[in-house]
Protein backbone atom coordinates (compact mmCIF):
# COMPACT_ATOMS: atom_id res chain seq x y z
CA UNK A 1 0.00 0.00 0.00
CA UNK A 2 1.37 3.42 -0.95
CA UNK A 3 1.11 6.22 1.55
CA UNK A 4 1.11 9.84 0.37
CA UNK A 5 2.39 12.27 2.95
CA UNK A 6 1.42 15.89 2.48
CA UNK A 7 2.39 18.95 4.50
CA UNK A 8 -0.03 21.78 5.11
CA UNK A 9 0.08 25.01 7.02
CA UNK A 10 -2.68 24.79 9.59
CA UNK A 11 -2.13 28.28 10.97
CA UNK A 12 -5.16 30.54 10.77
CA UNK A 13 -3.12 33.76 10.54
CA UNK A 14 -3.05 34.77 6.86
CA UNK A 15 -2.58 38.52 7.37
CA UNK A 16 0.98 38.37 6.02
CA UNK A 17 -0.15 36.71 2.80
CA UNK A 18 -2.97 39.20 2.37
CA UNK A 19 -0.60 42.13 2.91
CA UNK A 20 1.84 40.74 0.33
CA UNK A 21 -0.96 40.18 -2.16
CA UNK A 22 -2.24 43.72 -1.58
CA UNK A 23 1.22 45.19 -2.20
CA UNK A 24 1.59 43.18 -5.40
CA UNK A 25 -1.86 44.24 -6.53
CA UNK A 26 -1.16 47.94 -5.92
CA UNK A 27 2.21 47.86 -7.70
CA UNK A 28 0.73 45.79 -10.52
CA UNK A 29 -2.21 48.14 -11.04
CA UNK A 30 0.08 51.17 -11.21
CA UNK A 31 2.41 49.40 -13.66
CA UNK A 32 -0.53 48.42 -15.89
CA UNK A 33 -1.62 52.04 -16.07
CA UNK A 34 1.80 53.06 -17.43
CA UNK A 35 2.16 50.05 -19.70
CA UNK A 36 -1.21 50.81 -21.24
CA UNK A 37 0.09 54.24 -22.31
CA UNK A 38 2.05 53.88 -25.55
CA UNK A 39 3.46 57.37 -26.06
CA UNK A 40 6.25 58.69 -23.86
CA UNK A 41 4.48 62.04 -23.52
CA UNK A 42 1.43 60.26 -22.11
CA UNK A 43 3.56 58.52 -19.48
CA UNK A 44 5.09 61.85 -18.54
CA UNK A 45 1.65 63.47 -18.16
CA UNK A 46 0.48 60.54 -16.04
CA UNK A 47 3.46 61.07 -13.74
CA UNK A 48 2.85 64.82 -13.53
CA UNK A 49 -0.77 64.16 -12.61
CA UNK A 50 0.32 62.64 -9.29
CA UNK A 51 3.01 65.23 -8.53
CA UNK A 52 1.90 68.23 -6.44
CA UNK A 53 2.78 71.69 -7.63
CA UNK A 54 5.99 72.88 -5.88
CA UNK A 55 5.56 76.01 -3.74
CA UNK A 56 8.25 77.93 -5.63
CA UNK A 57 7.03 77.02 -9.11
CA UNK A 58 9.33 75.41 -11.66
CA UNK A 59 12.87 74.78 -10.52
CA UNK A 60 15.82 76.48 -12.17
CA UNK A 61 18.04 74.58 -14.54
CA UNK A 62 21.18 75.20 -12.51
CA UNK A 63 19.62 74.18 -9.19
CA UNK A 64 20.63 71.13 -7.19
CA UNK A 65 19.06 68.00 -8.72
CA UNK A 66 20.50 65.38 -6.33
CA UNK A 67 18.34 64.02 -3.51
CA UNK A 68 19.83 64.49 -0.02
CA UNK A 69 23.05 66.06 -1.32
CA UNK A 70 24.61 69.43 -0.55
CA UNK A 71 25.17 72.17 -3.09
CA UNK A 72 28.89 71.47 -2.98
CA UNK A 73 28.35 67.80 -3.82
CA UNK A 74 26.18 68.66 -6.79
CA UNK A 75 28.49 71.44 -8.01
CA UNK A 76 31.45 69.05 -7.99
CA UNK A 77 29.81 66.61 -10.41
CA UNK A 78 28.18 69.35 -12.47
CA UNK A 79 31.60 70.93 -13.03
CA UNK A 80 32.77 67.57 -14.34
CA UNK A 81 30.03 67.73 -16.99
CA UNK A 82 31.08 71.29 -17.85
CA UNK A 83 34.67 70.03 -18.10
CA UNK A 84 33.64 67.49 -20.72
CA UNK A 85 31.59 70.07 -22.59
CA UNK A 86 34.22 72.83 -22.74
CA UNK A 87 37.36 70.73 -23.15
CA UNK A 88 36.44 67.79 -25.40
CA UNK A 89 38.99 65.00 -25.33
CA UNK A 90 39.26 61.28 -25.92
CA UNK A 91 37.51 59.88 -22.88
CA UNK A 92 37.30 56.28 -21.81
CA UNK A 93 33.72 55.19 -20.94
CA UNK A 94 35.15 53.22 -18.02
CA UNK A 95 36.28 56.52 -16.49
CA UNK A 96 32.74 57.93 -16.68
CA UNK A 97 31.42 54.74 -15.13
CA UNK A 98 33.76 55.11 -12.14
CA UNK A 99 32.66 58.71 -11.60
CA UNK A 100 28.98 57.72 -11.83
CA UNK A 101 29.43 54.88 -9.35
CA UNK A 102 30.97 57.28 -6.81
CA UNK A 103 27.75 59.33 -6.56
CA UNK A 104 25.97 58.74 -3.27
CA UNK A 105 23.64 60.64 -0.93
CA UNK A 106 24.06 62.06 2.58
CA UNK A 107 21.54 59.62 4.05
CA UNK A 108 23.48 56.77 5.66
CA UNK A 109 22.23 53.19 5.37
CA UNK A 110 21.51 51.47 8.66
CA UNK A 111 24.15 49.04 9.99
CA UNK A 112 22.22 47.80 13.01
CA UNK A 113 21.88 44.05 13.50
CA UNK A 114 19.21 42.77 13.62
CA UNK A 115 17.52 45.63 11.72
CA UNK A 116 14.23 47.06 12.86
CA UNK A 117 11.46 48.09 10.41
CA UNK A 118 12.70 51.69 10.70
CA UNK A 119 16.25 50.58 9.87
CA UNK A 120 15.04 48.67 6.81
CA UNK A 121 13.16 51.75 5.67
CA UNK A 122 16.25 53.92 6.15
CA UNK A 123 18.43 51.55 4.10
CA UNK A 124 15.86 51.27 1.31
CA UNK A 125 15.45 55.05 1.04
CA UNK A 126 19.25 55.53 1.00
CA UNK A 127 19.70 53.07 -1.87
CA UNK A 128 16.87 54.57 -3.91
CA UNK A 129 18.29 58.08 -3.47
CA UNK A 130 21.80 57.01 -4.53
CA UNK A 131 20.54 55.25 -7.67
CA UNK A 132 18.28 58.20 -8.50
CA UNK A 133 21.24 60.60 -8.27
CA UNK A 134 23.30 58.38 -10.57
CA UNK A 135 20.42 58.33 -13.06
CA UNK A 136 20.20 62.13 -12.95
CA UNK A 137 23.94 62.48 -13.60
CA UNK A 138 23.72 60.16 -16.61
CA UNK A 139 20.75 62.13 -17.95
CA UNK A 140 22.73 65.37 -17.64
CA UNK A 141 25.62 63.81 -19.56
CA UNK A 142 23.21 62.94 -22.37
CA UNK A 143 21.65 66.41 -22.29
CA UNK A 144 24.71 68.68 -22.16
CA UNK A 145 27.37 66.64 -24.02
CA UNK A 146 25.30 65.95 -27.12
CA UNK A 147 28.11 66.97 -29.52
CA UNK A 148 30.44 64.17 -28.38
CA UNK A 149 29.63 60.86 -29.97
CA UNK A 150 31.30 58.62 -27.38
CA UNK A 151 29.67 60.31 -24.42
CA UNK A 152 26.26 60.32 -26.13
CA UNK A 153 26.41 56.61 -26.99
CA UNK A 154 27.54 55.71 -23.47
CA UNK A 155 24.85 57.87 -21.82
CA UNK A 156 22.14 56.43 -24.08
CA UNK A 157 23.08 52.85 -23.18
CA UNK A 158 23.32 53.68 -19.47
CA UNK A 159 19.92 55.37 -19.43
CA UNK A 160 18.40 52.29 -21.06
CA UNK A 161 19.97 50.05 -18.41
CA UNK A 162 18.99 52.26 -15.48
CA UNK A 163 15.33 52.67 -16.52
CA UNK A 164 12.70 49.98 -16.18
CA UNK A 165 11.39 47.66 -13.49
CA UNK A 166 14.19 45.13 -14.01
CA UNK A 167 16.98 47.63 -13.42
CA UNK A 168 18.82 48.12 -10.13
CA UNK A 169 16.67 51.16 -9.39
CA UNK A 170 13.53 49.13 -10.14
CA UNK A 171 14.50 46.40 -7.67
CA UNK A 172 15.16 48.92 -4.90
CA UNK A 173 11.96 50.84 -5.64
CA UNK A 174 9.84 47.68 -5.38
CA UNK A 175 11.52 46.80 -2.08
CA UNK A 176 10.76 50.28 -0.76
CA UNK A 177 7.15 50.13 -1.96
CA UNK A 178 6.76 46.80 -0.14
CA UNK A 179 7.71 48.52 3.13
CA UNK A 180 5.26 51.41 2.78
CA UNK A 181 1.63 51.43 3.92
CA UNK A 182 -0.18 52.02 0.65
CA UNK A 183 -3.25 53.59 2.17
CA UNK A 184 -1.22 56.51 3.59
CA UNK A 185 1.47 56.78 0.88
CA UNK A 186 -0.37 55.88 -2.29
CA UNK A 187 0.79 59.01 -4.14
CA UNK A 188 4.42 58.31 -3.25
CA UNK A 189 4.11 54.72 -4.47
CA UNK A 190 2.57 55.93 -7.71
CA UNK A 191 5.43 58.37 -8.31
CA UNK A 192 8.13 55.81 -7.48
CA UNK A 193 6.72 53.21 -9.86
CA UNK A 194 6.05 55.89 -12.47
CA UNK A 195 9.77 56.73 -12.50
CA UNK A 196 10.56 53.26 -13.75
CA UNK A 197 8.31 53.58 -16.81
CA UNK A 198 9.77 56.82 -18.18
CA UNK A 199 11.79 56.62 -21.39
CA UNK A 200 15.49 57.53 -21.69
CA UNK A 201 14.48 60.42 -23.97
CA UNK A 202 12.37 61.90 -21.17
CA UNK A 203 15.25 61.71 -18.71
CA UNK A 204 17.61 63.41 -21.16
CA UNK A 205 15.26 66.25 -22.14
CA UNK A 206 13.09 67.01 -19.10
CA UNK A 207 15.62 68.59 -16.75
CA UNK A 208 12.94 70.73 -15.09
CA UNK A 209 10.82 67.65 -14.44
CA UNK A 210 13.82 66.08 -12.70
CA UNK A 211 14.00 69.11 -10.40
CA UNK A 212 10.28 68.73 -9.69
CA UNK A 213 10.78 65.05 -8.85
CA UNK A 214 13.74 65.80 -6.62
CA UNK A 215 11.75 68.33 -4.58
CA UNK A 216 8.84 65.93 -4.10
CA UNK A 217 10.94 62.85 -3.27
CA UNK A 218 13.16 64.74 -0.85
CA UNK A 219 10.25 66.12 1.17
CA UNK A 220 8.32 62.83 1.06
CA UNK A 221 11.30 60.74 2.17
CA UNK A 222 12.15 63.15 4.99
CA UNK A 223 8.53 63.13 6.15
CA UNK A 224 8.58 59.32 6.02
CA UNK A 225 11.81 59.03 8.02
CA UNK A 226 10.61 61.38 10.75
CA UNK A 227 7.30 59.53 11.11
CA UNK A 228 9.21 56.28 11.60
CA UNK A 229 10.96 57.71 14.68
CA UNK A 230 14.45 58.26 13.25
CA UNK A 231 16.73 61.09 14.36
CA UNK A 232 18.37 63.45 11.86
CA UNK A 233 21.63 63.56 13.80
CA UNK A 234 21.96 59.78 13.43
CA UNK A 235 20.76 59.11 9.89
CA UNK A 236 22.36 62.05 8.01
CA UNK A 237 25.96 63.17 7.68
CA UNK A 238 27.05 66.16 9.73
CA UNK A 239 27.38 68.47 6.73
CA UNK A 240 23.72 67.90 5.82
CA UNK A 241 22.15 68.60 9.22
CA UNK A 242 21.44 72.28 8.57
CA UNK A 243 19.80 71.52 5.22
CA UNK A 244 17.69 68.75 6.76
CA UNK A 245 16.50 71.01 9.58
CA UNK A 246 15.64 73.71 7.06
CA UNK A 247 13.45 71.27 5.10
CA UNK A 248 11.82 70.09 8.32
CA UNK A 249 11.01 73.69 9.14
CA UNK A 250 9.38 74.09 5.72
CA UNK A 251 7.21 70.99 5.95
CA UNK A 252 6.20 71.79 9.56
CA UNK A 253 7.95 69.07 11.56
CA UNK A 254 9.54 71.26 14.22
CA UNK A 255 8.07 72.81 17.36
CA UNK A 256 9.31 76.29 16.42
CA UNK A 257 7.11 76.50 13.33
CA UNK A 258 4.20 78.19 15.12
CA UNK A 259 6.50 80.73 16.78
CA UNK A 260 8.16 81.49 13.46
CA UNK A 261 4.79 81.98 11.79
CA UNK A 262 3.69 84.39 14.53
CA UNK A 263 6.94 86.30 14.16
CA UNK A 264 6.54 86.55 10.39
CA UNK A 265 2.92 87.74 10.74
CA UNK A 266 3.90 90.38 13.28
CA UNK A 267 6.73 91.59 11.03
CA UNK A 268 4.34 91.82 8.07
CA UNK A 269 1.74 93.73 10.12
CA UNK A 270 4.27 96.41 11.08
CA UNK A 271 5.32 97.92 14.45
CA UNK A 272 2.71 98.04 17.26
CA UNK A 273 0.69 101.19 17.78
CA UNK A 274 1.95 103.57 20.44
CA UNK A 275 -0.04 104.76 23.44
CA UNK A 276 -1.62 108.20 23.79
CA UNK A 277 0.99 109.21 26.38
CA UNK A 278 3.78 108.72 23.87
CA UNK A 279 2.72 111.38 21.35
CA UNK A 280 5.99 113.32 21.67
CA UNK A 281 7.99 110.27 20.66
CA UNK A 282 5.83 109.85 17.58
CA UNK A 283 6.38 113.48 16.56
CA UNK A 284 10.15 113.09 16.91
CA UNK A 285 10.07 109.98 14.78
CA UNK A 286 8.03 111.79 12.13
CA UNK A 287 10.54 114.64 12.03
CA UNK A 288 13.45 112.27 11.63
CA UNK A 289 11.58 110.31 9.01
CA UNK A 290 10.78 113.40 6.93
CA UNK A 291 14.26 114.86 7.30
CA UNK A 292 16.00 111.93 5.63
CA UNK A 293 15.98 112.18 1.83
CA UNK A 294 14.49 109.33 -0.13
CA UNK A 295 17.05 107.05 -1.78
CA UNK A 296 17.47 107.43 -5.52
CA UNK A 297 16.48 104.68 -7.89
CA UNK A 298 19.24 102.83 -9.71
CA UNK A 299 18.17 104.38 -13.04
CA UNK A 300 18.30 107.95 -11.61
CA UNK A 301 21.75 107.69 -10.09
CA UNK A 302 24.59 109.54 -11.88
CA UNK A 303 26.36 107.44 -14.44
CA UNK A 304 29.75 108.31 -13.00
CA UNK A 305 28.90 106.33 -9.88
CA UNK A 306 28.53 103.16 -11.89
CA UNK A 307 31.53 100.96 -12.23
CA UNK A 308 32.64 100.60 -15.85
CA UNK A 309 32.74 97.10 -17.23
CA UNK A 310 36.13 95.99 -18.48
CA UNK A 311 36.83 92.77 -20.27
CA UNK A 312 39.83 90.99 -18.83
CA UNK A 313 41.80 88.74 -21.22
CA UNK A 314 41.76 85.02 -20.35
CA UNK A 315 45.50 84.93 -19.59
CA UNK A 316 45.18 87.80 -17.05
CA UNK A 317 42.21 86.42 -15.11
CA UNK A 318 42.92 85.70 -11.47
CA UNK A 319 42.07 82.27 -10.08
CA UNK A 320 39.05 82.01 -7.82
CA UNK A 321 39.34 81.54 -4.08
CA UNK A 322 37.87 78.04 -4.13
CA UNK A 323 40.16 76.81 -6.86
CA UNK A 324 41.85 74.42 -4.46
CA UNK A 325 38.50 72.84 -3.58
CA UNK A 326 37.63 72.02 -7.20
CA UNK A 327 38.71 68.63 -8.39
CA UNK A 328 39.20 67.28 -11.87
CA UNK A 329 36.76 64.40 -12.22
CA UNK A 330 38.11 63.26 -15.57
CA UNK A 331 41.95 63.12 -15.65
CA UNK A 332 42.08 62.69 -19.43
CA UNK A 333 40.82 66.26 -19.84
CA UNK A 334 43.58 67.78 -17.66
CA UNK A 335 45.96 68.33 -20.57
CA UNK A 336 43.38 70.27 -22.58
CA UNK A 337 42.30 72.32 -19.59
CA UNK A 338 45.93 73.12 -18.70
CA UNK A 339 46.56 74.35 -22.25
CA UNK A 340 43.53 76.64 -22.11
CA UNK A 341 44.66 78.10 -18.75
CA UNK A 342 48.31 78.53 -19.80
CA UNK A 343 49.66 82.08 -20.01
CA UNK A 344 51.04 83.10 -23.44
CA UNK A 345 54.82 83.43 -23.49
CA UNK A 346 56.76 85.71 -25.89
CA UNK A 347 60.12 84.47 -27.14
CA UNK A 348 62.82 86.67 -28.67
CA UNK A 349 65.61 84.59 -30.08
CA UNK A 350 67.09 86.96 -32.65
CA UNK A 351 66.63 90.18 -30.64
CA UNK A 352 65.13 92.10 -33.59
CA UNK A 353 61.48 91.35 -32.94
CA UNK A 354 61.10 89.30 -36.10
CA UNK A 355 59.68 86.16 -34.48
CA UNK A 356 55.89 86.15 -34.12
CA UNK A 357 54.02 85.30 -30.94
CA UNK A 358 52.44 81.98 -31.94
CA UNK A 359 51.17 81.16 -28.46
CA UNK A 360 49.42 84.52 -28.17
CA UNK A 361 47.82 84.08 -31.57
CA UNK A 362 46.53 80.66 -30.60
CA UNK A 363 45.04 82.00 -27.39
CA UNK A 364 43.42 84.94 -29.19
CA UNK A 365 41.94 82.69 -31.85
CA UNK A 366 40.51 80.43 -29.12
CA UNK A 367 38.93 83.37 -27.29
CA UNK A 368 37.62 84.84 -30.55
CA UNK A 369 35.94 81.63 -31.61
CA UNK A 370 34.13 81.40 -28.26
CA UNK A 371 33.10 85.05 -27.80
CA UNK A 372 33.02 87.26 -30.90
CA UNK A 373 33.06 84.93 -33.88
CA UNK A 374 35.04 85.25 -37.13
CA UNK A 375 35.52 89.02 -36.89
CA UNK A 376 37.56 88.74 -33.73
CA UNK A 377 39.56 85.84 -35.16
CA UNK A 378 40.67 88.08 -38.05
CA UNK A 379 41.76 90.68 -35.51
CA UNK A 380 43.71 88.01 -33.67
CA UNK A 381 45.55 87.11 -36.88
CA UNK A 382 46.45 90.76 -37.51
CA UNK A 383 47.74 91.12 -33.95
CA UNK A 384 49.83 88.00 -34.31
CA UNK A 385 51.31 89.23 -37.60
CA UNK A 386 52.70 92.41 -36.00
CA UNK A 387 55.89 92.28 -33.94
CA UNK A 388 55.49 92.35 -30.21
CA UNK A 389 56.06 95.77 -28.60
CA UNK A 390 58.04 94.18 -25.79
CA UNK A 391 60.84 93.18 -28.19
CA UNK A 392 61.20 96.60 -29.93
CA UNK A 393 64.73 98.02 -29.30
CA UNK A 394 64.67 101.10 -27.08
CA UNK A 395 66.00 104.47 -28.41
CA UNK A 396 69.09 105.93 -26.68
CA UNK A 397 69.65 109.69 -26.35
CA UNK A 398 72.22 111.16 -28.77
CA UNK A 399 74.93 113.28 -27.10
CA UNK A 400 77.51 113.37 -29.92
CA UNK A 401 77.11 115.18 -33.25
CA UNK A 402 74.72 113.43 -35.60
CA UNK A 403 76.56 111.29 -38.12
CA UNK A 404 75.01 109.28 -40.96
CA UNK A 405 74.43 105.64 -40.16
CA UNK A 406 75.97 103.03 -42.39
CA UNK A 407 73.86 99.91 -42.75
Swiss-Prot record:
Keywords, in A-Z order: Host nucleus, Transcription, Transcription regulation
Composition-biased stretches (Acidic residues): 273-286
Biased composition, class Basic and acidic residues, residue ranges: 287-301
GO-annotated cellular components: host cell nucleus
Signal peptide stretch: none
First-listed, main subcellular location of the protein, grouped into a coarse class: host cell
Domain of life: Viruses
Residue span of region Disordered: 268-330, 388-407
Compartments where located: Host nucleus
Amino acid composition bias (Basic residues), ranges on this chain: 302-312
Biological function: Acts as a transcriptional repressor of the US3 gene expression through a specific DNA sequence named the transcriptional repressive element (tre).
Homology family: Belongs to the HHV-5 UL34 protein family.
Protein name, as recorded: Transcriptional regulator UL34
Organism: Human cytomegalovirus (strain Towne)
Classification of source organism: Viruses, Duplodnaviria, Heunggongvirae, Peploviricota, Herviviricetes
